[in-house]
Amino acid sequence: MTTTGIIAEFNPFHNGHKYLLDQAHGLKIVAMSGNFVQRGEPAIIDKWTRAQMALENGADLVVELPFLVAVQSADYFASGAVDILAKLGIDTLAFGTETALDYNGLSTIYGKMAEQMSEFLTTLPEKLSYPQKTQLMWEKFAGVQFTGDTPNHILALAYAKACAGRNIRLRPIQRRGADYHSTEKTVAYASATSLRHHRQDPAFVAKSMPNANLFQTSPQVTWEDYFTLLQYQVLTQPDLTQLFQVNEELAIRIKKAIRQVTSFDQLVETVATKRYTKARVRRILIYILIGARETSLPQDVHILGFTAAGRTHLSHIKNKTRIISRIGSQPWDALTQQADQVYQLGNPKIAEQTWGRVPIRIDNTV
């Protein structure tokens, strides 16, 4: 039987995500971001609730991406997630994309020319952002042209790189409905961005996601819920460059801007440049919020939930892969657990995210 991996945020889970799961074949394993996500934001609802949504709508097993995989640029995000899914025995990686390309062919190209392609990146001007450099690399070596406004396509190319040399088949699924960044409400498949933007519209939410009631009754957060804490962190941290990926230039820009702005969005607008994209700045600000420092990634895989089929699969691989199903006196990943504790500060109604939590079990055999 096919074992399909899916890398996701489900922020929040919507009809387009259900479509992706419906189109995927065989056993479906999701590697999902935890309480902070790749574009540099706190997840609107917590990881356990999002895992439950996925399991109730087609996923068989949901595992957590460690913080330093989940909150990273596309290449590191993809590489870390594929590493985890490979440990779980996937043979196919399914993903949504705005552009239908031969991603398996692109993966083969990268597998043969990785050294030359990486070397090419080092020859490009420093003023270019990493996404811009990546775009030029793919144009030169594979004739692929795209813009920075198609994040799912950018991730798909990162998946092609991450799967190079592995026995994992790439299965792109054409994205349905609104664009990733769209806030449009009239389309059949609304984007996660639109759902976050219009979360106070119950009728829109109800038609746009399969778990509307669970979403609407769950504690929700945005960056503004953490802005005061972020201000405190920036103002009291004597040397921001001690934190993960904060260089001297960014530290100066952030220290200066934090005294001039009154909202998180203003802060991002003030700090971002052509070189430092808004997504990168948001991720940097999360590192500062959490107090993140570079650390090694955990070798164990943390389980958020499973169905009966997912539990059976775990029993088959338990002697090959180290599984964490409950975090107690022994930590799983200290930085992820630190991030969870900060996440809980955003809303007093958020339940405990780490200690003693056990995987969600969904019986969908009927």
From Swiss-Prot:
<keyword id="KW-0436">Ligase</keyword>
<feature type="binding site">
    <location>
        <position position="96"/>
    </location>
    <ligand>
        <name>ATP</name>
    </ligand>
</feature>
<dbReference type="InterPro" id="IPR008513">
    <property type="entry name" value="tRNA(Met)_cyd_acetate_ligase"/>
</dbReference>
<feature type="binding site">
    <location>
        <begin position="7"/>
        <end position="20"/>
    </location>
    <ligand>
        <name>ATP</name>
    </ligand>
</feature>
<dbReference type="GO" id="GO:0000049">
    <property type="term" value="F:tRNA binding"/>
</dbReference>
<dbReference type="Pfam" id="PF05636">
    <property type="entry name" value="HIGH_NTase1"/>
</dbReference>
<feature type="binding site">
    <location>
        <position position="152"/>
    </location>
    <ligand>
        <name>ATP</name>
    </ligand>
</feature>
<keyword id="KW-0694">RNA-binding</keyword>
<keyword id="KW-0963">Cytoplasm</keyword>
<comment type="similarity">
    <text>Belongs to the TmcAL family.</text>
</comment>
<dbReference type="GO" id="GO:0005524">
    <property type="term" value="F:ATP binding"/>
</dbReference>
<protein>
    <recommendedName>
        <fullName>tRNA(Met) cytidine acetate ligase</fullName>
        <ecNumber>6.3.4.-</ecNumber>
    </recommendedName>
</protein>
<dbReference type="InterPro" id="IPR014729">
    <property type="entry name" value="Rossmann-like_a/b/a_fold"/>
</dbReference>
<keyword id="KW-0819">tRNA processing</keyword>
<keyword id="KW-0547">Nucleotide-binding</keyword>
<comment type="function">
    <text>Catalyzes the formation of N(4)-acetylcytidine (ac(4)C) at the wobble position of elongator tRNA(Met), using acetate and ATP as substrates. First activates an acetate ion to form acetyladenylate (Ac-AMP) and then transfers the acetyl group to tRNA to form ac(4)C34.</text>
</comment>
<keyword id="KW-0820">tRNA-binding</keyword>
<keyword id="KW-0067">ATP-binding</keyword>
<dbReference type="GO" id="GO:0006400">
    <property type="term" value="P:tRNA modification"/>
</dbReference>
<dbReference type="GO" id="GO:0005737">
    <property type="term" value="C:cytoplasm"/>
</dbReference>
<dbReference type="GO" id="GO:0016879">
    <property type="term" value="F:ligase activity, forming carbon-nitrogen bonds"/>
</dbReference>
<feature type="binding site">
    <location>
        <position position="175"/>
    </location>
    <ligand>
        <name>ATP</name>
    </ligand>
</feature>
